[in-house]
Amino acid sequence: MTELNYISTLVIYYMKGRDYLIKEVIVVEGRDDITAVKRAVDAEIIATSGFGINAKTIERIKEAQKRKGVIILTDPDFAGEKIRSIISKRVKGVKHAYISQEDGLRAKDGNIGVENAKPEVILKALENAKITLEEKQEFFNMTDMYYFKLTGSSDSKARRQLLGKILGIGYGNANQMVSRLNNYGITKEEFIDAIEKIKKQLGE
């Protein structure tokens, strides 16, 4: 897999478009932040749901850090810094990306957050965190989801829940699961091993 370091990230990103994605998993606070980040870059993203961050989310962030590395991009306010501190204490070695309050300000109501930042602001913040770009890999697709009953079956949701728990990548719909399997670097061997464990748990 080809990787490109942060030094020329902006240039390469605009040259290559979405043939590359950010290697690290980005941690934000909420769904609106996810939308804003996805306007700027292609990456896996975890939302903490604000102060609602729980043990499951921490474990998922730990797994992401182990597999791909993590970049924290929380709001430039007290709550954002508190969440950043909580994660940093529990997950060692994470990278940090910051936007200024000015860049995160929504003028009409004074709201401050990542959700209000322009794509170029977010991309620059991530570049400053020394991101790595890697070529997209598609080892898994929707055919796998159907074949292994992760979609299209009456118990597909339960199977995806178990798969996410076993692999440490969290629950998602079929499309989200395909994305995570590819972007987290899950191997075919890990996947098949997880499928076998699911079958045993379901008594098959």
Where are these regions (language model features)?
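N-terminal amphipathic/basic-hydrophobic helices that include classical n-h-c signal peptides
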Residues: M1-D19
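Short active-site oxyanion
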Residues: L21-V25, K68-I71
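Short, flexible loop segments at the rims of nucleotide/cofactor-binding pockets, characterized by
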Residues: I22-K23, A47-G52
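Short hydrophobic beta-strand that contains or immediately precedes a catalytic carboxylate
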Residues: V27-E29
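Conserved structured catalytic cores and adjacent interaction surfaces
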Residues: R31-D33
